[in-house]
Amino acid sequence: TSSLVGSEMCIRDRIYGAMLAGGSGTRVKSSKIPKQFIEIGGKPIIIYTLENMLKVKRFDYIYIAVHKDYENYMNEQVKKNIPESEKVRIILGGKERMDTINNVTTAITNDNGIHDDDVIVIHDAVRPFVTEKILNDSIDCAAEYGACVCGLPCADTILHSKGGEYVEDIPVRSELYSGQAPDSFRLAHFIQMQDNLTEEQKKVITGTSQICTMNNQPIHLIEGDAINFKITTDSDLLIVRTLLGGK
């Protein structure tokens, strides 16, 4: 947001949400469409996620990257369900996760430029119950430390097995956390780390915070929430339907 003061333009740093929604979601066997677009109670899951993100009024814009086959559908759903649709930008995702992330950061900088302390909060479309606390903590943490991920201490013992037949190792559980989303960053810092990646590194990234570890950059950890789970399987989908009142 900018305002004219005297003859100078005063521009504050901005906070962007980003939602990655270009995946195919093959582990939900009961649906032929990507899980983020499965409708519950007349709305796709991604809209529930967006509604929770928009509860945080600090976001200037939220960018949603979707597959081209769902671009028109997503635009229609936003217009139908989101009163603050002027805050939402629908863009096309890429072939791989890193391509999609690059499309998001490129769209943001093309639309708005880039300022020193802009923050980007990158969330999964299939974590519809993200809380305001997680989002606000993520913004604050990224602004202070540059990079932030939320996670929970592992409740189960983790078994390391290369082939799924024998246990190779049992890591110390007290040192293990289950990573969630969002992953949040100072935008300029994040873009610089993106640019530093090799093509080989880009192909193996499964989580956004890996961009930091591949750049040997520290990531601050904040506490997640069990309700902020990712919809991965049919069992998860059943839980979501129950939490949304059996819709």
Give the residues covered by each predicted segment.
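N-terminal glycine-rich phosphate-binding loop and ensuing alpha1 helix
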Residues: 14-72
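Hydrophobic helical membrane-anchoring modules
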Residues: 228-247
